[in-house]
Amino acid sequence: MKKKKLLSFLLAGALSVSALSIPAVAIAKANEATKQTYVPTISSKENTMKIDLLSGQILKFASNYSKDYADKVIKDDLQIDRFAPTPAKLTWEAEDGALYYTLKVSKNPDLSDAQIFLTFTNEQSIEDLLMGTKYYYQVVAQFENKTVKSQIFSFETSYLPRTIEVEGISNTRDAGGYYTEDKTHRIRQGMVYRGGKIEDGTEAGKAKLLNHYGIKTDLDLRAEATASPLGPTVNFVNVSGPYYAGTGDSGTGINSLADSSKGPWKGTYRDALLEEIRTFTNPENYPIYVHCSLGRDRTGTIIFLINALCGVGEKDLFMDYETSFFSRLGRADNQTASNMVNTPFQGLYTYVRKYAPKKTLAEATEMFMLDIGITQDEIDSIRSILLEEV
């Protein structure tokens, strides 16, 4: 009875625990366990081994993406968050009488570095999985006088934007997970997060950024604050970042940085963008949370430049940007996705593309960065930190 009360307490606090949190007796019994032929199954919309971590309008948008598709999916003017991630739900079948189950979930076939969940039922919801990633799992059923262990099974998450839920903060997601155009690499996940202003976050939300996502750098592109809402333990980079590729003499776009005839703020915005980009050259700065106010314009510009530099293709770059319109802040100024995608964001893409129209977008972005003063060593550093082979 005491053991059941202890497990109930653990489950009430948090289902995800480390191996050290499991009672020693259970570990000893699990080590002696023999394989048994009961079959865990995955419950998903299509009842397949592919799990969608999005649902509703955002799932329809991301699964069938084409430019300015958001306005065709969203049929109202409500400024609400529509892209909360959907947990994966694992279920399994076992003989009656189990006291509790231990579920191990890992990205590794041998279940090393596994997340461990304890549950009294034959199902478990798992939050915050990575996009486009294969996972392995095993269920261990603990009975009064025996331990029954399943074989190792697997499932894969769909290649859809990895949105995250941070209480109080809108427009939050992982900027990684996307493949390069040649499919040889992808952007590491859990390295760069993007979203809206942090000060909107509850204490629980800010604690989640610090403790769950491990944020080490708050890259604030508004130049309005003197300290991070996340506290003194994070590296605070605060600049007034340029956005898009402005027209006329606005001087606010990245096209003004390399052309002395554009706008009075050329030097200021150039220095700001250099500091933004150089934040990504230091491995000690990661994970980074990048934001402006809405998490769409200044944030969208720097995320475009970093991911384009690393080789992400046009479709994924546009989809990541347009995902903002499924958030409360992304629509806070009543702009439509169609207008913003086809005018300022398309202008940003076109401007960078012109640096090397016959080469890849990654090469064109590299040439732009070299033009404004980023060095080749700094470019190489960003790529080495953010890219992983596939």
PLM regions and their residue ranges:
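Cys-dependent protein tyrosine phosphatase-like superfamily
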Residues: I27-Y289, I302-V390
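Ser/Thr-glycine-rich phosphate-binding loops at phosphate-binding pockets of nucleotides
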Residues: L294, R298-T299
